[in-house]
Amino acid sequence: MNIFIKQNSSTVKRRYPLQKFVLKFLWLEKNLAVTVDQVTNRGNSPITEYFFWPRKDAWEELKDALANKPWISYDESIALLNQTTDVINYWQEDEKKPSLSEAQAKFPNCIFTDKFANCLYEN
């Protein structure tokens, strides 16, 4: 399964082997949004809406959304929530936010974009 992310007129190909779920983040100056996609052999399928931090408690909303998906195991939910915590902490650790490319380098198993329309999927 390939994921293509369009950024600044270039396309970056990434592979997420053996992952059942992938976290996607909308990386903005004043907000961070997170959603979860299920990785299938046909591409990704969104399973949650975007949850925004710090506008709302994105972590708590994501926890509730995952709890309502009985086909996501407790361990998978914990792993997704722990990764979300790490990204939120990284995003808010300094007054000057890390760049999108720094976030991508630090969390290579997540998808990041700074513009909602830039996230494209192809098989």
Swiss-Prot record:
GO biological process, one term: translation
Coiled coil regions in record: none
Signal peptide as annotated in the record: none
InterPro entries: PSRP-3/Ycf65_sf (IPR038447), Ribosomal_PSRP3/Ycf65 (IPR006924)
UniProt entry keywords in alphabetical sequence: Chloroplast, Plastid, Ribonucleoprotein, Ribosomal protein
Gene3D superfamilies given in the database record: 3.30.390.140
Keyword Ribosomal protein: yes
Molecular functions per Gene Ontology: structural constituent of ribosome
Subunit architecture: Part of the 30S ribosomal subunit.
HAMAP family: Ribosomal_plastid_cS23 (MF_00619)
Function: Probably a ribosomal protein or a ribosome-associated protein.
PANTHER family: 30S RIBOSOMAL PROTEIN 3, CHLOROPLASTIC (PTHR35108), OS04G0461100 PROTEIN (PTHR35108:SF1)
UniProt name for this protein: Small ribosomal subunit protein cS23
Organism per entry: Mesostigma viride
